Each structure stands twice: as C-alpha cells, then as structure tokens.
C-alpha cells in the first residue's frame, strides 16, 4: 500500500494503480486486497467529498509489542469488543514477527513509528490500511489530522480475513516500511531512488509472477516508495510478487538486496 498524499496523486497520473491495472482479471493487492495507491487513483476518499462522514474520536493509547497504538474505543468495549480483541491480537502477531526479524538498533527506531486502528473508518476504504505521510491530504478531506505520520488500519476486522493473509502476510511490515522510509531515512533518500531508477531502466519489474501464478507488472514499479516497501517484504519475510523471498531478491535485484541489507541489517 502506498502512503496516501499529494505525491501519490501525482504518481497515479503516470501509473494508475499497480500490476493489476494491466491484468484483465484484477485482483488488487491491498484494497480488500486494495492498494492505497488505488484509493488515490479511483479516489473513493474524494469521490463523495460532500458526503464525508466525520470519524473523529479520542483513541485509547495502548502499548502493543513496544509500539504506540491509537485504538478506537469501539474495539475495547461494547458489542465489538470480542472482535476488537481478536484484531488487536493479530496486530500483535504482526508486530511480534517484526520485532524478531529486526536487529535491536533498527527495531528501536521502528518502534517509534505509531499505528492507528479503527473499528471501521466510514470513508477510507483501503484495507488493511495505508500510511499517511502528511496532514494536508487528510484535512482537505475532513479527516482526522491526527492520522498524519501513522500507519492507519482502517477496518480492524480486515486483519483477521483469510484473503488478506494469503495475499500479503507482511502488510503491517509494508506500511511500517513506508513510515520508516519517511520518518527515519527520508523519502528523498538517494540510494533508494538510484536503485529504483536502475531497476526501472533494466525492466526487471515489468513482468513477474504474483502469488496467484499470474504474470503482472510488479507493484514495486509504481514509484521508489513502493519499491522500498515491496523489497522490504521480500527481504525480511515474504512478498506476494516475485521476488517473493530474500534469496530470490538477491538473484533478481542484487542492488536492492544489498541496499536493504545495509538498511535493515544482514539476515544470518
């Protein structure tokens, strides 16, 4: 999923959505599998501007596996508490895996990045959720500005759904990678941009296998931000596009592999 913001509206002008934009049998990665880039392309957030529902609430701040998580009170009390407890347990599962995989110094930085989880946001339909890099995109649409600089899980129950786990078991890692890119490395980090440009010139992401066995354009080809987040999934865990895992990444895109090894640390 892409960070939602102005830069992605610009990116969509050049490339509308991801590989499935070219696939005659669309199966979006992160929009219910939906991608947040798709949410900007189709812009469900702005399609009904006059009908935006206010979804502001005071979250309950929880520490989950060392991360600060802003929790919708509906997930903790009342009729949705059981489902909420299961969703928060699954979020903890995602975060536990990240905590195991990252070296201590990188983990310390990663845990500074915050998460916001809604029972069900009425307008932002990207699932399980995007990363919001800035306030402007949010305030222009009447959304809570406190979502800025946070990974936003827009519908808690999406974390429990089988199709999401099959497609992208590292979705929280993907979104936290966006946050890390933005807040720790900087979206203008030159090494990532250079690696992305080299890969695009070589065309190595133009046609790859996805988790369904279909040949598609890799979501990493969208822009350098998705290139980094998608590569992070493969390097640290498993992605839903080839290269799926680290050994394949090392063979397919050694420049990105070595860069990620420097950023995240060696895996031995």
Identify what each model region corresponds to.
Residues 62-85:
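Acidic/histidine-rich, surface-exposed loop or edge segments in extracytoplasmic proteins
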Residues 140-148, 162, 196-268:
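Metalloprotease/metallohydrolase-associated module, dominated by Zn2+-dependent proteases
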Residues 2-49:
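Compositionally biased, proline/threonine/alanine/serine-rich low-complexity intrinsically disordered stretches
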Residues 47-61:
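Short acidic, Pro/Gly- and aromatic-enriched capping/linker segments at domain boundaries
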Residues 62-63, 107-109, 220-224:
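Extracellular/periplasmic catalytic domains that process cell-envelope and extracellular macromolecules
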Residues 85-197, 201:
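Acidic/His-rich structured neighborhood in mature extracellular/periplasmic domains
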Residues 4-7, 11, 87-94, 168, ...:
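Stable alpha-helical elements in mature extracytoplasmic
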Residues 76-77, 120-123, 234-236:
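Short, solvent-exposed loop/turn segments at secondary-structure junctions
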